């Protein structure tokens, strides 16, 4: 049985904090792989500044190309919208019966987990790992990285550098395509 962590998010854009977190959870939770599930739509977030799905997926793939055990996935792009986690996990379990899935979420989401669609079913059928985020504790102890995609987008819009906040390949991709320049 392959143990896979499902780390969903907008990744708008993916940054070094996402990657460091995925690598740490991969090791600490004894998972075989982590799939960064690039979400086309989060039912709990407004989507005004969400970059096109294909661009966010391509940035994630660029960022992860040399990261062992972590890969970007477009699985949710092919599901009905909105893409609720319960539906995603059910479909993954059907399509990958030889995999055991663990849901990876932030402590901010964990604090409000009882509002999630089919939250009790998720807890009954899957492991859930919550990492500390935005002053919310998680179910595992990890150092917090004070990096956010929102701040990165703001820096780009203001003409400030993003060196060290995103992988070099992602920074180049963003600059070549002039992404997030006018938000």
Descriptions of predicted regions:
Residues 1-183:
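Nucleotidyltransferase catalytic core that binds NTPs
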């Amino acid at each position: 049985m392959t143990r896979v962590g499902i780390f969903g998010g907008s990744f708008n854009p993916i940054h070094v904090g996402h990657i460091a977190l995925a690598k740490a959870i991969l090791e600490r939770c004894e998972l075989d792989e982590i799939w960064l599930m690039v979400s086309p739509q989060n039912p709990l977030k407004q989507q005004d500044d969400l970059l096109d799905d294909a661009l966010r997926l391509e940035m994630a793939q660029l960022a992860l190309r040399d990261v062992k055990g972590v890969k970007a996935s477009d699985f949710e792009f092919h599901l009905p919208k909105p893409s609720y986690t319960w539906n995603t996990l059910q479909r993954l379990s059907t399509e990958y019966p030889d995999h055991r899935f663990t849901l990876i979420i932030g402590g901010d989401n964990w604090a409000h987990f009882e509002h999630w669609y089919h939250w009790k079913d998720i807890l009954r059928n899957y492991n859930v790992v919550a990492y500390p985020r935005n002053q919310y504790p998680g179910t595992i102890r990890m150092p917090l990285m004070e990096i956010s995609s929102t701040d990165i987008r703001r820096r780009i819009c203001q003409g400030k550098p993003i060196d060290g906040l995103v992988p070099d390949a992602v920074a180049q991709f963003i600059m070549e395509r002039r992404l997030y320049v006018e938000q």
